[in-house]
Amino acid sequence: LMVTSAATAGVLKPLMSPAELANTMDQYEPIILDIRGDAYAEGHIVGANSAPYGLFRGPKINPGQLLDVKTLEQRFESLGLELDRPIVVVSEGANDSDFGAAARVYWTLKSSGFTDLTILNGGKQAWEAAGYPIGQINVKPQATELNITFTQKWTATTEQVVSVTKGEIDSLLLDARPASFYAGEKSHGAAARPGTLPGAKNYYYASFFVPGAAAISSAIDVASLKATLGIEDKQEIVSFCNTGHWAATNW
């Protein structure tokens, strides 16, 4: 469950096209995290570290669960991350759902104190399609030492969500899942029961994409979106789905 808020500015934009990233790599020398797992060995952006999506998620029985700070810190150190160095998150880019993986990693890093972050829009496939180099050398990052603090600023607790459903907190519950899940016609294995949270509105995460595309569209009318959902100025939004994957895209 993710609470929305404004992004902190860095040298990189939160979302970058392959061309934008290619034009800034020499200047900023970002750490590139390839979150695709085994596919990394088949080819990746030159210089990218392999950082499988599962490193940022909970156990198989509850992948949406947050990891404890010590575990996160150890994993970030093994990836050679530095708090003051730009980081690029790269998914496969095979479909719109892939973006949720990158967004979930982005959210986890941001909540852990990393401020200069970007997602490669369209992922590795968009990078390769644009003609930029792909390599197969396995990068072994040098471990770092970190002391992170995980902020709860963008996390909603169960107790807080219950208060929202009771009208005790003025926040908007936003269900990122397809309409069939929202209506209870389908159910994910991770869900306790079919349906949605009381009072929640539905905004399918794929609405941010042109049908069939893996990159988020730039033609998003924010004012119209706020009006459609009835979002008030400065109102907090609690984004949710089944495991924090699709919800991260809406966040």
Put a short name on every predicted segment:
Residues 1-5:
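Bacterial N-terminal signal peptides
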Residues 7-40, 124-190, 195:
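Flexible, polar/low-complexity N-terminal or interdomain linker segments that lie immediately upstream
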